[in-house]
Amino acid sequence: MPASQRRAERKREILDATRALFDERGVRDAQIEDVARAVGINRAIIYRHFSGKEELFAMTLVDYLAELDEALSAADEPTSPPARRLEAITEAFLDFGSGHPAFVDCAQALLRRRGDELFEEVSESVMLKLGVGMTSCLSHVVRVLEAGAQTGEFHVPDPYLLANIFYTQGLGVLNLATLQLSVRGENSPTRGARGETPTGLPSVDAVPFEQVKAYMQRGAVAMARGDVD
């Protein structure tokens, strides 16, 4: 077997092991040592293929994005009205994130880094793959926004910007749904008058995922229509 093929196979083994650990334990609890142990190699070998933990995370996210791309493609029906298409894509994104909590953690872990900081820790080739994966997913939303603009239903000056907003907003909502923790003031001894914030200790409550999806779908369509001046 050529050395290049062996290297590619080993790299694939490392990524598969990382993905399995992410899905099993979550991103926070996955360590380089655990990945090396799962593959049956020394951790030093991992650093021959990846510059560090951030680059390994980025390449694992590329795998998640490829699957998300397929899910968004399957959900979109080009013959449907733009608003319905946007609702379907929003639902598909949220369902994917709900089924893959580690995807949300991995994406948010990288989003916490400034672009210039990430470039210092991740090679240009990996950043390119990550960018292609992100763009492929965002393009589903962009095409729907552009279709809605052509019919006059949507008013979006910068479709890619709004698609990026949807992406980061969706990750935040998925984190809320995963934590199942929303803060309420319903246990306050007295409620404030004239719409004032009630006093008392906050309480916590569950987050109904179907209701979250409905809010996100309506919100996405409203933003695309320009109903949020």
Ranges and model annotations:
Residues 9, 13, 21-55, 59:
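Helix-turn-helix
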Residues 17-21, 92, 96, 176:
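Short amphipathic alpha-helical elements of helix-turn-helix/winged-helix folds
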Residues 24-28, 79, 100, 151:
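Short coil/turn segments at alpha/beta junctions that flank glycine-rich nucleotide-binding fingerprints
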Residues 59, 73-103, 163-166:
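Hydrophobic alpha-helical connector segments
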Residues 95, 135-151, 164, 168-229:
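C-terminal peripheral helix-coil segments that are non-catalytic and often amphipathic
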Residues 95-143, 160-161:
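Short secondary-structure transition hinges
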